[in-house]
């Protein structure tokens, strides 16, 4: 017979992040000890950037952004060409449940593959090639936080700084160049 151990002082990280966001929105202050350490640090950086956790989408790809996208893709051509086979492999393996994104060292989105219809959901309409997902612009998110931390990052639903991203869980892995610098 399997022995069951009682769970004491268990915390639900999603509940804790919801409570932290509610307190932040109502009191203007982030309570300590409610979030995982790396999420707490990222939320504090997001606050330092002056972001509102209730900020809406920033939809739109204007003419200047289109021109910038072409330059961005050309600047990152070696990275894109090098990782395309791996992106294809990941899309093939992840099935019909998500998307795979390639970003650069500044958290600019270079490519999106997979179930792109997911992007039509509220909260993700401003996620497209050429959009920047740095912590300074979007708060805690897998792409931007992995760039800052320089290590694999999991943002589980409500741990995103922006409330509108709470339905989504995201993982990001930095791609280092031969010198160990994050290149994507």
Language-model region placement:
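Fold-independent oxyanion-binding glycine-rich loops
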Residues: 105, 157-159, 173
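A general structural signal for short secondary-structure junctions and capping/turn motifs
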Residues: 92, 145, 161-162, 177-178
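Intrinsically disordered, low-complexity terminal regulatory regions
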Residues: 1-134, 145, 154, 167
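Short hydrophobic/glycine-rich mini-motifs in sensory/regulatory modules
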Residues: 175-184
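Short loop/turn segments at beta-alpha junctions that line or gate ligand-sensing/allosteric surfaces
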Residues: 135-140, 146-164
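A short beta-strand signature within small-molecule sensing/ligand-binding domains used
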Residues: 164-174
């Amino acid at each position: 017979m399997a022995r069951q151990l009682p769970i004491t002082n268990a915390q639900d990280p999603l509940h804790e992040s919801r409570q932290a966001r509610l307190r932040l929105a109502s009191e203007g202050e982030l309570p300590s000890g409610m979030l995982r350490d790396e999420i707490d640090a990222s939320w504090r950086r997001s606050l330092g950037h002056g972001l509102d956790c209730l900020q809406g989408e920033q939809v739109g790809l204007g003419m200047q952004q289109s021109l910038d996208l072409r330059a961005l893709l050309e600047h990152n051509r070696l990275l894109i060409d090098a990782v395309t086979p791996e992106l294809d492999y990941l899309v093939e393996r992840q099935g019909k449940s998500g998307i795979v994104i390639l970003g650069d060292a500044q958290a600019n989105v270079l490519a999106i593959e997979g179930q792109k219809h997911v992007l039509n959901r509220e909260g993700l309409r401003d996620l497209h090639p050429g959009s920047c997902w740095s912590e300074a612009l979007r708060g805690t998110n897998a792409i931007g936080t992995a760039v800052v931390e320089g290590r694999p990052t999991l943002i589980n639903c409500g741990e995103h700084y922006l409330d509108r991203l709470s339905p989504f869980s995201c993982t990001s892995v930095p791609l280092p160049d031969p010198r160990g610098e994050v290149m994507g």
